Amino acid sequence: ILENIRQIQMAAQLRPSETIDTADLRLTIEMETGTGKTYTYIKTMYELNKLYGWSKFIIVVPSIAIREGVCRSFEIMSEHFAAEYGKRIQSFIYDSKQLTKIDQFASDSNMHVMIINTQAFAARGEDARRIYMKLDAFRSRKPIDVIAATKPILIIDEPQSVLGADKKNATREKLKEFKPLFTLLYSATHRADDIVNMVYRLDAMDAYNKKLVKKISVKGINQHGSTATNGYLYLESIELSKGNPRARIG
């Protein structure tokens, strides 16, 4: 596996991986915003099914809004991919109260993808806990055990938001419960310390050169008349949050 990954990386002029963790195999894909990330990972599922027969996929997203957008993308592109591959992916949004869909996901040999937001399995509420509970309505089984038994392929959309900065937070720990075959991480802005086994990079300049985006705008700031004896302002950091963006000025 390592040699195959290294060959792909060298062909793409990316830094080759020195080692891999086969117990937690992750591959990083960097794609500039607006270049078709969702389309790409849907096509990746079809190709993995075509080449290797893998049929169980889970897309993990950071919010309900993104979850709904991904679900809509599957609906919109359904005909396109069906025409190309001659089959359809059965997609559904995870709901702790609709357990029959999990049974279908696990037992059906066709391609299935479950779309789930982090709050549905990593929050502290009762709904989030149901996935780890033996449920009478589910023949005294735990939904997570049924899902994990399929050895799904995890696709993490916007991992910098899904995983967060804390290396031991609840989301990271709970993701291990899915026991994935491997994990694909798709984003334009990966956290530097979460980049592992980069196999594809489409940055802003590449996207512009390939005419996938219209233009790149860069704003410069010049300082005039400075004698270097006075204080000065500099951008210390940009703080990302669910609210308005904030910058820290030093």
PLM feature spans:
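RecA-like P-loop NTPase motor core of helicase/translocase proteins
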Residues: I1-G250
